[in-house]
Structure formats: structure tokens, C-alpha cells
Swiss-Prot record:
Residues 47-73 have a biased composition (Basic residues). Residues 1-137, 179-206, 383-416, 446-587, 622-654, 670-767, 780-826, 942-988, 1043-1101, 1132-1162 are annotated as: Disordered. Residues 179-188, 493-502 have a biased composition (Low complexity). Residues 27-73, 347-383 form a coiled coil. It comes from the Eukaryota. The lineage of its organism: Eukaryota, Metazoa, Chordata, Craniata, Vertebrata. This is Zinc finger CCCH domain-containing protein 6. The modification Phosphoserine is found at residue 1150. GO terms for biological process: negative regulation of DNA-templated transcription.
Length: 1177
């Protein structure tokens, strides 16, 4: 409110203002009426304007609050705080033009209006001016309250109310002058110009409030800046002086006009100054832009700065925690400080404060130690013995004691470089000390380089640490690419099992193409067998050994003919491989290693299918370390092999190939850097960048060569690659004998009998592989000797020499095995060492697993039985595993069928059986009968029919009780005289024996049960006991096709001869298998020791069976009863088949033991046990 309005309100009626004339009468009453009217009008307008501006003020306050929230924490500089002023200037000028008339009304000094406001001479114009003045000034006062309300205190409010209106006209004059002098361009400097002309202290606020009230001429940001331009100090004036105001209104400063309450809230009095309390607490985020004073020295907190302790504190000297002032605990506790003058902590004398700090630190250390001891005591109280603490200095990575020669690769592999390794090794040089088991494999004693425990990855043919130039061609044997012309180069190292003195004339390689690699047509045999290179019969297109001079004892053969161009092979490669390298290096191929991992290793791998071929090739090409490609580039021509040097006898490692690669890669890289020709530098430089993927200690999980996952992946890929490399040549070899297709499929199967039992449905082409010397291929000693050494021993390759004659054919390998089988195979291969020469006393895998593959080939196979097998005769009483069971009273109720019904049933059963003989795969008798001749079948049909009558169940106890127990007393020496007379017999019986995986063990002796050793079922003690009553099979088991006329058909001697050794074996196996179901009679159980004999003498069973069957069939020409019609048999078949379970005497608790009855004649046996037998027996 203006002073005039205050005066109008405060003045009583009739009270005169200064200078008014006290006239009475008519004029006074008129004047009073006019005054009242004016008062009412002014009050109404005042109320309206007040309401209007109150609403506007509230709106703007809410907007400003929102804006302040966003801008509060980010102190903005001058550039960001100034909005563009052009639009504001235009608005200001237009609004000024609108209001020029009202401004000019104020040209008359305002004091004059005030002086004459009460006189009669007051004109309507002056009254109107007074009204507008009061309105507009009220607006300005509201806006000033709006903008200063938060920061003004009572003094400021009083000041604005107490100031008189006498300066108002001068303010307007100054304002217009400043606008005109600046050429109507408003800027921040206008306020300074105005102030520099000596305006009184409150002038600027008047101008600002006026500007705000008339069209909001200033932008928000500028207004706020100008409003907050000075500090508020208690006293009659807001400003202490012009200088002070100008100092705080500089553009860089953002001082706000704050209330004392606000100041007290955010500052603390410190040494007589109001200091920003956040600064004193060390957490003022505004820094130099803070509104409050930071002029104080902070006391540091009595703690060491943890960031300084860790190495770097960003706050430096401004940090409120102690840095170098903190006392050094080593120096002050009496220990030696190894940092000396460079110590980060203070070595100054201790003060009271620093002594307290030091004591606190030392006590904390002691508390930690005491806490450990307390924990150990608690563990001991609970009965737990804590592990001893490791000695000091033992960390996660062991200190390297003996190292591989990273510093000087020229030295021997076994060289101890502890003197050279005094520098701290990098992570890539640290070699974890091996366990005791691996110590002899890593440099301690040099075993064969390619150990038989694990197939080395192909990268090691080239990345061995000896810097030998292995190739005499310019091309690189790229890891996954195809080799042209079927060239292989087995670069063997001097310590490997395949290393022998070179056999073959050295000669220059005949290369039609610079990318051809020298190939070998020789396979190196094991030390125990050959003693030198085993030269196999090679195809005419191959020949001519090339002896590389730098490798003493490395035989390399070169093809004499080239059947396809490298371009054709390049087109056959997978697209992934074609992208992986240039065309020249692509022509070196994975088949480069084919003879390096000889063909005999193919026994460990299943033939793969086509579908996975490209995948394996491409994966391996991506994963293979570039070392393989690099080393091949070392040679620049045929003469490059002469530059090969063999610095060291290579020590080998049985570690996984990924570990070997990680150990040998640094060495190979150095040799490549030293000896690489200049022409190959660009290629090597590019590939060296990829070598980091093979770093064993790399921390990147995404690199192929690092991490446990990639190591396992590498192992799987290497085994797949070995198979890749071995299989393509087998497909391209000459199809000489179509029967060998089956042999090839079986030859690639895994030797392990656990995997043998699963029949593989592998489909191979009939022209695949040609083993040239079958004696070498199928020698079981060699198979056994190398069975556990899948790719490591090159002795496996001594049995095959497979050459390509059509290298232009499509190189595709087949892959059927999944990763689980690969990992299992890796475990098997690394499980144990198998010596190269198999000692005679050691029993290895069942040789039948290999014989099954060769059953179609006529050849001599000599299998030795153990010495004790010929001299042991087992008595039945020696073989009783458990006491005999008591008879089942319920099952003895079953009565036999009348003869005619029984014979009809048997006849039907026999007819269906003979029709479906091959279908009963569970019955070993059917498997054997499928191979027997018709003569044998006619002679033995009676007995085999009995076995089939039980329903073909392998586990049926009655099937196991078909043997006369008296036969087992007789010596079984005759069976051993026929060791391997006819390979046809083994060929006919063994494949069927292996037909069903469940029968793999007892199958060899099973045919004898059927064909020759089935005594008549009327023998009472052979009946089944313990079966549930009423089963139909129990009735059928008692049915006998015995013909009384044929009593002499099989004498006891012949029966014993037939059944001697093999009968006991088969009975033992089948009887023990079913011993949980029924208690076997003494004749059923056999020699546990014969299992070894059975493992090694699979041929005896079939051979003895068939020779004895032939003998018995010649003597017994009487046909079986089944050849007669059923009606003709009615009078012939009397009850001799009667139910054996009723044969017991009433007082018998169990069947009579074998000892009592074995020596009695047949008649006495039947009279004793079978009261229903006919009188003539």
C-alpha cells in the first residue's frame, strides 16, 4: 500500500493533512462525499486486483517450485543460466510502447499529487493518476512480495513499506534513460548502469518490481539472479553499500537473498564466521558455487582415508580424512619400514593424537589375531580339528620353481631355469607345479612325445617347441582344410612310439604343385613288434620315401602322381573353411595328419554320419590355434627341410592337448619370430593376434582357448578331428573285396567291451577300406596291446596302409556319435597306461569282441587257454553255491496230461517253433539252431524241442534243469583237444552269440545245451521246483519226447563227451543268472574260474559242440518221434514222461543228492524215483 493510502486509512474524518486549509461549510461536505465515493471505488478495485494477483502469484509459485526442483542440485554456469534475450527484449519493447502513455502520466512529480490530494482543486485527471498509481504500485508490491517472500525478513518487509513514494518518479526517469541509452537492447548491464549513476540503495528493487509488474519484462532466470544479488544483513538497509552489492552481483556468483532463518539452517558459526555446515562436514556438493562461506580450515577426521590407503584419493588435500599425516604403524611400532623416506605415512614423532591413532590401529590388528584364535578354540571345543594355516607367501598361484624355457627356448626342455626366472613372471608364464602323477610327464622324465594315454591334438604336430621346419612346401596344412592328392606327412618326433630309424631311400619330393605336402605311405609300428618301420604293401601310385635330413628317423613319403588339382579340392571344402584362409594355405588339410594318427586308431571311433561332418570341420577350423597354419609357412620350398634343426630330444606330455598347447605356444611363437622368412611375415603377424585365444590363463571366458568349458570343448573337438582325419582316406581307397565293407564298419567300433554290446547301425560304403595284410590287421595280440591307447601309439597304425588313388573324390567323413560318448571316450583313454608290448599273463578285453567282426573271413585264429583249464575237473558237490530247497507241497499236485494230449501239444509247439526259429532271440538254443545243418537238426530235434517247450524264456528254471547230473562227473578233457579246428564253426556260432547283447557272455556255450546235451525230462531230480502251481509251462516242462526204442541213441559216454566242458560253462552261467528264481540242482552250477577260460576260448564251445554232434549224429540215425503222425504214436508213448514232482518217496524232504545216484545204472535211477515207470525199464 502506498503512503497516501495509509494516510487515508489512518486519518480520522476532518483531520487535515499538512498544508491543507481548514475550510468549513459547503465545500467541506462536498469534499467528504467525493472522498467517500473515491474510497469505495479504490477499495473495490484494490480488492479485485488483490484477488486476481493472488491467484496469479500462486500459479507462478507452483511453477517456480517445479523449476527449482530440477535446478537445485546442478549449479549452472553463466552460459547455461542465461536464456536468449532476443525474444524477451522484443516483448519488453512492445509492452513498453503500449504503456508509454501511462508512463508519461507520471512525469508530473508524484509528490505534487500527494500534496494536493485533499484540496478542492484536485482534478479528475489527477485523481485518475492517483488511482492508477496506487493500483500499479500495489501490483508491484505484490510481485515483490512474491519474489522476495521466501528470502525477506521483517526488516526487508518494513523497509519496503516504509520507503516513501518521493523516489518513484526519479525511478521511472532512470529506467527510461537506461532503456534509451542501451538502444532498447536490454541486458544484464542495464542494472549496473543504473546503479553506477548513484541510485540509492533500494532503487534497483524498485525498478525490478516495476518491471515485473508491467509485463514481466525480465526473463525468469535473470530476475532470480538479480533478486538474489546480495546478502541480507540485519539493519536499516538491505545492502551494506554499493561496493558490497557489486561484489556479490558478479555473474560468477549465485548469491541469493536469504532469510536469516535459511542462513541459520545451513550454516554453522565457526571461529566467528558463518561457515557452510556441509563444507565443515565434508559433504558440500556445490563447491565453489556454494552460497555459503567455505573460508575455514577443516579439522581432519581421526581416521586414515581408505582411498589413500588403496593408492589414490581424488580429493587430495581437501579430503577430510587423514592422508600422509597418519602415523606409520611399522616405523612407530619398532619394526622396519621398508618404504623408508617414500613411505606414504608419517614417520614424525608421535603426538598425543597420533599416539592414540596408532594404538587404535595396533589394537585392531591384535583383535583380528585374537579373533582367529578364538575361532580355532571354538572349533577345537566342538571336536573339529582346524586345518593349519598355509605358510606365508602361499597364494592362489604357486611360486614358479622350475619353469619351461620361456626365457630361452633354445635350451632343452628339461633345463632348470630357476636362475633365469628371478623376475616376477606374468600370468602367462606361470606354470602351475604338476602333481606327482604328472611330474614325469612334464619335463621330469621324457616319455614318448605322443603318449598312448591321450591322442594329442593336431596342433602339436606343428606347434612343438622344437623349432624344426616340418614341411617342405609353401602351403600351410590348415587345421580343417582338405589335403590334395591324399598327401599325409607323419612328422614324428624322436621320442614318440612311432619313431624308428628311417627305412627307405631319401629322395627329393616330386611335387607337381607347390602346395603339395610330402606324404607318407609308411606306418610306424610299435617298439615291441617291429623295431623299425613296417613297410606295408602300398598301392602302385604311391611310393618313394623322402627322408627329411633335419629329422633323423622321420620317414616321409611323397606321392608320385597327382590325381586332382588343388582347385577341385578347394571347391569341395566347406564354405566356412574356404573363408578361413587364402586358397594356397587351404590346400594343406586335416588329412595331413591322417597317417600321423594311423588308421588303427579308428578302432576307437564310430564311423560318423555325413550330417555332422561340416559342423566338425568348421568348428575345428575356427577353434584350431593359428600355430598350425603358421608353422607350415616356415618352409619355402623343397629345400626348406634341409634347414630343419632338432635342438632337443622332445619330452612328451600326457596332459590333455589343450594344456600342452598352452605350454608350447609361447615357444613356438618365439621360434616363428626368429626363423620365419620375410615373405611370410604379414600372414604370421595377422595370425599371431589370434594366438592369444590359446592362452591358458586368459581371463576372457569368450575366447576359444581359455576357460574350463573351452578346454573340454577342445578335447572333444580334437577327438572328432582325429576321426575326421582318419576316415576320409578309407572312403577313397580301392574297393577290392566287397566283403570288406562289413569288416570296415566293424573295425571302427570301440574296443571297449562295454560299448561292444550295443549294435551300431552304421552304414558305410562297400568300397571303403582295404587292409592290405590281414595278419597284421586281425592279430588279436596287437588288438589287445593297443586297445587302450586310442590315438597315442602309432602301433595301432601298423596294421593299415591306406592310400588315396582318387583324391578328387568328395572328402566327407561321417559322424554319428554325440558329445557324451566323446567325453566318455576321453575318460577311458586317459584312465591308465597300457604298455606297448602286452605281457602274456595279463588278460585283456574279450577277444570275441574282435572276432565278431571277422567272422566272415576264413583265417587261422589261435587263442590260448590258460594252462589250468585242461587239468581241472569239477565235481558237482564242489559247485553247490547254496543248500537245496525243500519241495513245494502245492506244486506236486499238478498231474501229468495223458500221452496223446501231451504229444499233440508238443507237436503243435514244435511246428510253430520250427517256423519261427529266428524270432526267439532270447533263447540261445534258437540262435544256435539257426546255424546247424539239417542232419544235425534231425538228430537233435527231440531235445531242442524240449527246450522250446518251456516258452523260450531264458530265465525259466526248468530250462536250466535239462541236464543229467551224472554227466558232470566225467572228465572234460576231450573238449580241450579241439582248440581251433574249423574257423567256420566259430564263424557260424559267434555272430549269433553276439546277436543279442544280453547273451554276450554265455552265448558261446549255449548251443551245446540245445543240440546235444538235453537229456529226457523224465529224470525226476531235474524237474522244476518252486514254481507257482498251475502254470501251463510247468505242465509242458514235464513232457518228454523220449522214445523207448531209442535207448541206445545217446549213451552215457557220448552224452558226457558232448557235454563235458561246455556244458558246465553254459550251465554255470545260465544257472547263476537265474539262481535268484530257483535253486539249481548240482549239475547246474559250474566253475567260477572258467570265466577266464571262457573269455579267452570262445571257439572251444562251438567247435566241440559241432564235432561231437557230428559224431553222435552218425551213430544215431533213428529219426525223432516227431517224424511220425500223431495217431501212430498213441500206442507207442506210454507214461514214461510222467510228472517228476510226484516221483519223490513220501519220506523224502529234498531230492536225493547227486553223490548217491551218480554211479547207479539208468534202470535203478528210474526204478527208485519213478514208480509209474514201465516194468521193462
Amino acid at each position: 500500500m502506498t503512503d497516501s493510502e495509509h494516510a487515508g486509512h489512518d486519518r480520522e474524518d476532518g483531520e487535515l493533512e499538512d498544508g491543507e486549509i481548514d475550510d468549513a461549510g459547503f465545500e467541506e461536505t462536498q469534499d467528504q462525499e467525493a472522498k467517500e465515493n473515491e474510497k469505495q471505488k479504490n477499495e473495490k478495485a484494490y480488492r479485485k486486483s488483490r484477488k486476481k494477483h493472488k491467484k496469479e502469484r500462486e500459479k507462478k509459485k507452483s511453477k517456480r517450485r517445479k523449476h527449482e526442483k530440477h535446478k537445485h542440485n546442478s549449479p549452472s554456469g553463466d552460459d547455461s543460466s542465461d536464456y536468449s534475450l532476443d525474444s524477451d527484449v522484443e516483448r519488453m519493447q512492445s509492452s513498453r510502447k503500449k504503456r508509454t502513455s501511462s508512463y508519461r502520466d507520471y512525469d508530473v512529480p508524484f509528490s505534487q499529487h500527494r500534496r494536493i490530494s485533499g484540496s478542492y482543486m484536485t482534478s479528475k485527471k489527477s485523481q485518475h493518476n492517483k488511482k492508477t498509481n496506487s493500483k500499479e504500485y500495489a501490483e508491484s508490491s505484490f510481485y515483490s512480495d512474491d519474489y522476495f517472500g521466501n528470502y525477506s525478513d521483517d526488516n526487508f518487509g518494513n523497509y519496503s513499506n516504509q520507503e516513501g513514494e518521493e523516489d518513484f518518479s526519479s525511478q521511472l526517469k532512470y529506467y527510461r534513460q537506461s532503456q534509451e541509452s542501451s538502444g532498447s537492447s536490454f541486458s544484464k548491464e542495464s542494472g549496473k548502469k543504473l546503479r553506477s549513476k548513484g541510485s540509492p540503495p533500494g532503487t534497483e528493487y524498485r525498478i525490478k518490481s516495476f518491471d515485473v509488474s508491467h509485463g514481466h519484462l525480465l526473463p525468469k532466470k535473470i530476475r532470480r539472479k538479480e533478486h538474489c544479488g546480495a546478502r541480507v544483513i540485519k539493519g536499516p538497509y538491505v545492502f551494506s553499500g554499493m561496493d558490497d552489492f557489486q561484489e556479490y552481483s558478479k555473474p560468477g556468483k549465485k548469491w541469493k537473498v536469504m532469510t536469516q532463518e535459511f542462513i541459520n539452517q545451513h550454516t554453522v558459526e565457526h571461529k566467528g564466521k558463518q561457515i557452510c555446515k556441509y563444507f565443515l562436514e565434508g559433504r558440500c556438493i556445490k563447491g565453489d558455487h556454494c552460497k555459503f562461506n567455505h573460508d575455514a580450515e577443516l579439522e581432519k577426521k581421526k581416521e586414515v582415508c581408505k582411498y589413500y590407503l588403496q593408492g589414490y584419493c581424488t580429493k587430495g588435500e581437501n579430503c577430510i580424512y587423514m592422508h600422509s599425516e597418519f602415523p606409520c604403524k611399522f616405523y612407530h611400532s619398532g619394526a622396519k619400514c621398508y618404504q623408508g623416506d617414500k613411505c606414504k605415512f608419517s614417520h614424525d614423532d608421535l603426538t598425543k593424537e597420533t599416539r592414540k591413532l596408532l594404538d587404535k590401529v595396533l589394537n585392531a590388528d591384535e583383535e583380528l589375531v585374537n579373533e582367529d584364535e578364538r575361532e580355532l578354540e571354538e572349533l577345537r571345543k566342538r571336536g573339529i580339528t582346524p586345518l593349519p594355516k598355509p605358510p606365508p607367501g602361499v597364494g592362489l598361484l604357486p611360486t614358479p620353481s622350475e619353469h619351461f624355457p620361456f626365457s630361452d627356448p633354445e635350451d632343452d626342455f628339461e633345463t632348470d631355469l630357476s636362475d633365469d626366472m628371478k623376475k616376477i613372471p606374468s600370468l602367462f608364464e606361470i606354470v602351475v607345479k604338476p602333481t606327482v602323477d604328472l611330474a614325469h610327464k612334464i619335463g621330469k622324465k621324457p616319455p614318448a612325445f605322443y603318449n598312448s594315454t591321450s591322442p594329442p591334438g593336431p596342433q602339436f604336430e606343428e606347434s612343438s617347441h622344437c623349432p624344426q621346419r616340418m614341411y617342405s612346401s609353401e602351403s600351410s596344412p590348415g587345421p580343417g582344410s582338405k589335403v590334395p592328392q591324399g598327401c599325409e606327412s607323419p612328422v614324428r618326433h624322436p621320442g614318440s612310439p612311432g619313431h624308428h630309424p628311417c627305412v627307405g631311400p631319401p629322395g627329393p619330393p616330386m611335387q607337381e604343385n607347390p602346395s603339395l605336402l610330402p606324404s607318407s605311405s609308411e606306418i610306424v609300428g610299435p617298439h615291441s613288434q617291429a623295431g623299425g618301420l613296417v613297410q606295408l604293401d602300398t598301392l602302385p601310385s604311391m611310393g618313394g620315401a623322402y627322408h627329411s635330413p633335419g629329422f633323423p628317423g622321420h620317414s616321409v613319403k611323397v606321392p608320385r602322381e597327382s590325381h586332382s588339382s588343388p582347385a577341385s579340392l578347394y571347391q569341395q571344402m566347406p564354405s566356412e573353411m574356404q573363408r578361413s584362409a587364402d586358397s594356397e594355405s587351404m590346400q594343406g588339410s586335416a588329412e595331413f595328419y591322417d597317417d600321423y594318427y594311423p588308421q588303427h586308431a579308428a578302432h576307437n571311433f564310430q564311423p560318423p554320419d555325413n550330417s555332422a561332418d561340416e559342423m566338425w570341420h568348421e568348428e575345428f577350423a575356427q577353434q584350431q590355434p593359428p600355430i598350425a597354419r603358421d608353422t607350415a609357412h616356415l618352409g619355402s620350398g623343397p629345400n626348406s627341410s634341409s634347414r630343419m634343426t632338432s635342438h632337443c630330444p622332445l619330452s612328451a606330455s600326457g596332459l590333455p592337448p589343450a594344456v600342452q598347447r598352452a605350454l608350447f605356444i609361447p615357444l613356438t611363437q618365439r621360434y616363428q619370430e626368429d626363423e620365419e622368412p620375410a615373405g611370410t611375415q604379414p600372414h604370421r603377424a595377422s595370425s599371431k593376434e589370434e594366438d592369444d585365444t590359446a592362452n591358458w590363463y586368459s581371463s576372457s571366458e569368450e575366447e576359444e582357448g581359455s576357460g574350463v568349458k573351452s578346454i573340454l570343448r577342445t578335447l572333444q573337438k580334437q577327438t572328432g578331428t582325429l576321426r575326421n582325419q582318419q576316415l576320409p582316406p578309407t572312403e577313397l581307397s580301392v574297393p577290392t573285396d566287397p566283403r570288406l565293407a562289413k569288416e570296415k564298419r566293424k573295425r571302427n567300433q570301440v574296443v571297449d567291451p562295454r560299448l561292444r554290446t550295443v549294435p551300431r547301425q552304421d552304414i558305410k560304403k562297400p568300397h571303403e577300406s582295404v587292409p592290405v595284410d590281414l595278419r597284421l590287421v586281425w592279430d588279436p595280440k596287437k588288438l589287445r596291446g593297443n586297445g587302450g591307447a586310442p590315438g597315442g601309439s602309432s602301433a595301432r597304425g601298423a596294421e593299415f596302409d591306406l592310400r588315396h588313388t582318387n583324391a578328387g573324390a568328395n572328402h566327407k567323413s561321417k559322424r554319428r556319435e554325440d558329445d557324451d560318448e566323446d567325453s566318455e571316450r576321453e575318460l577311458r583313454e586317459k584312465a591308465f597306461l597300457i604298455p606297448l608290448d602286452s605281457s602274456p599273463g595279463i588278460v585283456l578285453q574279450d577277444p570275441r569282441s574282435q572276432l565278431r567282426q571277422f567272422s566272415h573271413i576264413k583265417m587261422d585264429i589261435i587263442l590260448n587257454k590258460p594252462n589250468f583249464a585242461k587239468h581241472i575237473v569239477w565235481a558237482p558237490e564242489d559247485l553247490l553255491p547254496v543248500p537245496l530247497p525243500k519241495p513245494d507241497p502245492v506244486s506236486s499236485i499238478n498231474l501229468p496230461l495223458p500221452p496223446l494230449i501231451a504229444d499233440q501239444r508238443l507237436n503243435r509247439l514244435w511246428n510253430t517253433k520250427s517256423d519261427h526259429q529266428g524270432a526267439l532271440s532270447l533263447d540261445p538254443t534258437s540262435a544256435a539252431k539257426a546255424k546247424l545243418s539239417l542232419t544235425h537238426r534231425e538228430g537233435c530235434l527231440e531235445q531242442s524241442g524240449d527246450l522250446h517247450s518251456s516258452g523260450g524264456k531264458l530265465g525259466d528254471p526248468r530250462l536250466q534243469k535239462n541236464f543229467d547230473p551224472r554227466l558232470h562227473r566225467l572228465p572234460n578233457t576231450e573238449s580241450h583237444q579241439v582248440t581251433a579246428k574249423d574257423s567256420h564253426s566259430s564263424r557260424s556260432a559267434l555272430p549269433l552269440a553276439r546277436w543279442n547283447p544280453a547273451l554276450s557272455q554265455p552265448s558261446t556255450a549255449a548251443p551245446i545245451n540245445v543240440a546235444s546235451v538235453t537229456p529226457p525230462l523224465y529224470a525226476p531230480k531235474l524237474s522244476s521246483e518252486g514254481l507257482p502251481p498251475g502254470t501251463s509251462s510247468s505242465v509242458l516242462s514235464g513232457i518228454s519226447l523220449y522214445d523207448p526204442r531209442d535207448k541206445g541213441s545217446l549213451s552215457a559216454t557220448e552224452l558226457s563227451t558232448i557235454s563235458s566242458g561246455e556244458n558246465t560253462e553254459s550251465q554255470k552261467k545260465s544257472g547263476l543268472k537265474n539262481s535268484d528264481k530257483n535253486q539249481p540242482s548240482p549239475g547246474e552250477v559250474t566253475v567260477p574260474q572258467n570265466t577266464t577260460a571262457d573269455m579267452e576260448v570262445p571257439v572251444d564251445g562251438p567247435v566241440d559242440m559241432q564235432t561231437d554232434i557230428l559224431r553222435s549224429a552218425d551213430k544215431v540215425q533213428v529219426p525223432a518221434v516227431h517224424s511220425l503222425p500223431i495217431q501212430a504214436l498213441t500206442g507207442l508213448l506210454r507214461p514214461p514222461y510222467s510228472d517228476p514232482r510226484q516221483a519223490r518217496e513220501p519220506g523224502q524232504a529234498s531230492p536225493t543228492p547227486d553223490e548217491e545216484t551218480d554211479d547207479k545204472p539208468l534202470k535203478e535211477v528210474f526204478k527208485t524215483f519213478d514208480p509209474t515207470a514201465s516194468p521193462f525199464c
